[in-house]
């Protein structure tokens, strides 16, 4: 099964000049979604994994299924002020401004090896912020797994250059 066949491309969304890669067409097809989860697990099996983390919100769709099947704890990286307990937080740059993601301080233990899953990587700013949250807990990144890599935007390559392991299921141009 070619997962790329299940990704809808929407031009000029959310703004002119952007070609949006829509995963909803993949996750609404049970067989395609199952194949995607199986591919994430296959790409992850060579890494030591203590916990699985995901970036809000579409990353949760994939990571919670993987976490369940691998019987590993699931950690949520959330937008600012969405978690009720004490958090670590990281600010990062977006195209137009800054954003903040957080994780509960008690979610990740020292020396944990954390697999980070997200639906898509573009420039990699959010992924780098997630890595910082893991490292603030004195834990390490097992690897990143992205369903979609917008290869011409360079995020995946930037993570590799910083020494992280990266697995991409599908490559698309970002424009």
From Swiss-Prot:
Q: Where in the cell is it found?
A: Cytoplasm
Q: What is its EC number?
A: 2.4.2.7
Give the matching InterPro entries.
Answer: Ade_phspho_trans, PRibTrfase_dom, PRTase-like, UPRTase/APRTase
Q: In its keyword annotation, does this UniProt entry include Metal-binding? A: no
Q: Name one GO biological process term.
A: adenine salvage
**Pathway where this protein functions:** Purine metabolism; AMP biosynthesis via salvage pathway; AMP from adenine: step 1/1
Q: What class of enzyme is it?
A: transferase
**Domain of life according to the entry:** Bacteria
UniProtKB keywords = Cytoplasm, Glycosyltransferase, Purine salvage, Transferase
SUPFAM superfamilies named among the record's database cross-references: PRTase-like
Q: Which GO terms describe its cellular component?
A: cytoplasm
Presence of the UniProt keyword Isomerase in the record = no
Q: What does this protein do?
A: Catalyzes a salvage reaction resulting in the formation of AMP, that is energically less costly than de novo synthesis.
Q: How does it assemble?
A: Homodimer.
> Which family is annotated?
Belongs to the purine/pyrimidine phosphoribosyltransferase family.
Name of the protein in question: Adenine phosphoribosyltransferase
